[in-house]
């Protein structure tokens, strides 16, 4: 049946989409939406996906390093475990200031992607030295809560100024 969209963070619309479309379903969403900085209600979304046997894929490019305990991302920020997802993916280019990214999933999913993803098959892996740089960026990110606190302060200040200027 192809891909179907549902309204932004509207779980009732997603539930209707499940009912109106037969066949297997897969749900993909962002953890933190870049335009507004809002997040889906992940506990409810996970439950709805489980109820409809729909794997949930979370792109946490804007959540990793920014929200959650030690910058662990959207699921952590909402008190949930990443294990409730079929796939968790993010890039290293936002909070970590690097290139590349990752996709975390169960062994069956990873094996399938290894065998069928042209971008994976025909690409060069990140070098060990580069991976060490990413590891150190993650270590620094986890240890520096003050940076996440300052970011949230800056976001709040910007929103207040935008509202006062009649922009929001």
Range-by-range predicted roles:
Residues 30, 59, 101, 134, ...:
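Residue-level signature of catalytic and energy-coupling elements of molecular machines
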Residues 3-58:
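Active-site phosphate-binding strand-loop segment of PLP-dependent enzymes
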Residues 87-89, 96-145:
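Conserved core segment of the aminotransferase class I/II
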Residues 8-9, 29-32, 60-61, 78, ...:
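Fold-independent oxyanion-binding glycine-rich loops
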Residues 53, 73-92, 111, 115:
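Conserved active-site segment immediately N-terminal to the catalytic lysine
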Residues 40, 128, 132-168:
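Conserved PLP-dependent catalytic core of the aminotransferase class-I/II
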Residues 35, 64-65:
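Catalytic P-loop NTPase motifs of RecA-like helicase/translocase cores
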């Amino acid at each position: 049946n192809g891909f179907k969209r549902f309204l932004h963070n509207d779980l009732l619309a997603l539930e209707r989409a499940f009912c109106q479309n037969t066949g297997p379903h897969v749900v993909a969403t962002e953890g933190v939406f870049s335009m507004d900085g809002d997040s889906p209600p992940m506990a409810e979304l996970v439950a709805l996906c489980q109820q409809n046997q729909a794997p949930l894929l979370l792109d946490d490019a804007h959540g990793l390093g920014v929200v959650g305990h030690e910058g662990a991302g959207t699921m952590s920020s909402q008190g949930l475990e990443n294990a409730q997802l079929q796939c968790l993916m993010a890039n290293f280019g936002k909070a970590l200031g690097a290139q590349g990214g990752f996709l975390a999933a169960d062994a069956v999913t990873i094996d399938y992607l290894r065998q069928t993803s042209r971008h994976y098959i025909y690409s060069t892996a990140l070098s060990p030295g580069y991976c060490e740089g990413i590891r150190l960026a993650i270590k620094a990110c986890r240890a520096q809560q003050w940076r996440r606190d300052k970011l949230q302060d800056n976001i709040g200040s910007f929103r207040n100024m935008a509202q006062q200027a009649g922009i929001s």
